[in-house]
């Protein structure tokens, strides 16, 4: 008998890793500019074009890379992501949670839902743990060089991927299965068995959906940056997150203890369903 699906979904920047990934893997070292200046240009471009800030940052990354003569191949982007800094304990987190879930009779899967660069995340050491990496992605030509944006995931776009997971229609390009009628009881990953870990404003719509549908939204903060803890506290106060913890993924941390509680609650829900 197949074990019931359970899902841990994560934002990346500020959730699994400190700061913005582009600031560690691209902007200061290769572009030779301050990250604040880069993001200021993104804002100006998005406003001037009345466009999306995710598309704006992706456009500027490619434009400035071409001006510098930087390599744009898929492999080069993944190499840039290989040394992304992660919060303490992240690399050991996934196997530990999987073992706990299995002991409870659950089949735990991990997903990324991020506005950051998919190619950078694919190059990180934790990439193999994810069922899918839903993140903004470049379009590549036949030479495998980035030529434009293939996928941009902004703060509201993130909610789409919750429903893809919920209905287990995982292909980004599939517009039919995701819109097909499917009763809640028939969905492979009900929201009650989904936890979402996120850190900021771009995660608010996702957290709202999670809260409204009985999921487990968790606000993550960087203990080294007090303003992020204040932001997490505000998410709790506003009813957007149900739980909050610092970005310490080591065994025995507050966040690890919350994961134990969440998995136990998911397992109790499965048992309750058996008697309905």
What positions do the PLM features span?
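Alpha-helical substrate-recognition element adjacent to the catalytic core
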Residues: 1-142, 241
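C-terminal cap/substrate-recognition subdomain and adjoining C-terminal extension
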Residues: 81, 85-111, 115-276
